[in-house]
Amino acid sequence: MADKHLNSMMENLYWWGIPTLFRCPNEEAKNQDIALVGVPHSTGNGTTERDQHLGPRALRNVSSVGRRMHNEFQLNPWEAAKIVDVGDVPFPRANDNEDCIEQITRFFGKLDKSGTRPVSIGGDHSITGGIVQALGCGEITKGEPVCLLHLDAHTDVFTKVDHFLGAKKSAAHW
């Protein structure tokens, strides 16, 4: 928009525009510090009847009304770093868990080559393996261990089985 006043008003309307995490720009990862990535995947559970694939969209909707500055710490992450929402990992074969894990690994491999650090929003637990595989041998880590912050109510880790409902790379184990 050419009118700066109108553009400023529209940016404050959380229901307007492309829904992104915390209303950050929807841009490519190149020359950015952090890329927010949606990973809308549920088939690591052997079914899409569970709704983990709806997580990225739901979080984008909820985060759009939140404040972009932490009042207690007086921290505005968008001033401290260049943060963008690069959208979702595409899953043309969304019901094929093995293919989805390959798509995740490819997507995060390309993201790693851009030099941008990812923050991913899933999806079921099976997304973790593909992400760690891509980043563990990537440019950013240069062979160093990958740091993983996994926020969940439970781990769903099973070490005594080689599959979960037929999925070899599943939400249950890697």
Predicted regions and their residues:
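Conserved alpha-helical scaffold segments that buttress catalytic/binding sites
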Residues: A2-W174
